[in-house]
Amino acid sequence: MAEARASRWYFGGLASCGAACCTHPLDLLKVHLQTQQEVKLRMTGMALQVVRTDGFLALYNGLSASLCRQMTYSLTRFAIYETMRDYMTKDSQGPLPFYNKVLLGGISGLTGGFVGTPADLVNVRMQNDMKLPPSQRRNYSHALDGLYRVAREESLRKLFSGATMASSRGALVTVGQLSCYDQAKQLVLSTGYLSDNIFTHFVSSFIAGGCATFLCQPLDVLKTRLMNSKGEYQGVFHCAMETAKLGPQAFFKGLFPAGIRLIPHTVLTFMFLEQLRKHFGIKVPTT
């Protein structure tokens, strides 16, 4: 009897944290590009400006908030998706149909997006702080300090500013990443040319990262603008209308850096996740 291993519910959060440590500078540059009122700098120019102005370590501003976000948002969506997927397939002979994976991904992402909104808000603010004049900077010491100060100075409700947008984006990203990864891996393995190895994980996660980038970019731009606002937007629709005034391309501002960040992040997340599953997962006997 052969032996397989299933992922533990918290592996998704750990894998996402590992990926976030590698891709955080790209995430920071993406936020900077999206919060420009006009297109002035591209990714390389923005990176050089940040390093020149605040030093190399400034590329890791807000890392604690990013890790906090992964341990709320990503842990929740991975835990729900993988737990429900494994439950739904434990007595079946084959994998879930793709539409079921999409449904699971949507539900998991909506829930994870809502749970992760407070940490996401602090993450965006910490990354964008260096762009503000010194007198206007929030200067959060770390993620927990940011969460506490937002709740104390602006209200608990403010912690969930942009929750609708974050949840919607979470659903799209999770469909793009988890659902498409499962489907891509299934299709790659079904060819018979590749086995369940690191190269298969790389190819499948690269495809998933591309799908997630295209699905969520317009919502990602609106979410970032809403979370970084000081009350100038009345809601999601108003934010969308104001962004539309800048032209259709405004909804895809930062698309290239978003892909440069999200695709490697997706690849690293699933590479870490598969290694965690392989070495530390729950043993599942199979015939």
Swiss-Prot record:
Location in the cell: Mitochondrion inner membrane
Signal peptide limits: none
Membrane-crossing segments per the record: 9-29, 62-81, 102-122, 162-181, 202-222, 254-274
Membrane topology, as annotated: Multi-pass membrane protein
Principal location class: mitochondrion
N6-acetyllysine: residues carrying this PTM: K158
Documented activity regulation: Regulated by circadian protein CLOCK (Circadian Locomotor Output Cycles Kaput).
Superkingdom to which the source organism belongs: Eukaryota
Solcar repeat windows: 7-87, 100-187, 196-279
Pfam families named among the record's database cross-references: Mito_carr
GO molecular function, one term: malate transmembrane transporter activity
Keywords: Acetylation, Antiport, Lipid transport, Membrane, Mitochondrion, Mitochondrion inner membrane, Repeat, Transmembrane, Transmembrane helix, Transport
GO biological process entries: gluconeogenesis; glyceraldehyde-3-phosphate biosynthetic process; lipid transport; mitochondrial transport
Organs and tissues of expression: Expressed at very high levels in white adipose tissue. And at low levels in brown adipose tissue, kidney and liver.
GO terms under cellular component: mitochondrial inner membrane; mitochondrion; nucleoplasm
Catalytic reactions on record: (S)-malate(in) + phosphate(out) = (S)-malate(out) + phosphate(in); malonate(out) + (S)-malate(in) = malonate(in) + (S)-malate(out); (S)-malate(in) + succinate(out) = (S)-malate(out) + succinate(in); (S)-malate(in) + sulfate(out) = (S)-malate(out) + sulfate(in)
Function: Catalyzes the electroneutral exchange or flux of physiologically important metabolites such as dicarboxylates (malonate, malate, succinate), inorganic sulfur-containing anions, and phosphate, across mitochondrial inner membrane. Plays an important role in gluconeogenesis, fatty acid metabolism, urea synthesis, and sulfur metabolism, particularly in liver, by supplying the substrates for the different metabolic processes. Regulates fatty acid release from adipocytes, and contributes to systemic insulin sensitivity.
Stated family: Belongs to the mitochondrial carrier (TC 2.A.29) family.
Protein name: Mitochondrial dicarboxylate carrier
Lineage per the UniProt record: Eukaryota, Metazoa, Chordata, Craniata, Vertebrata
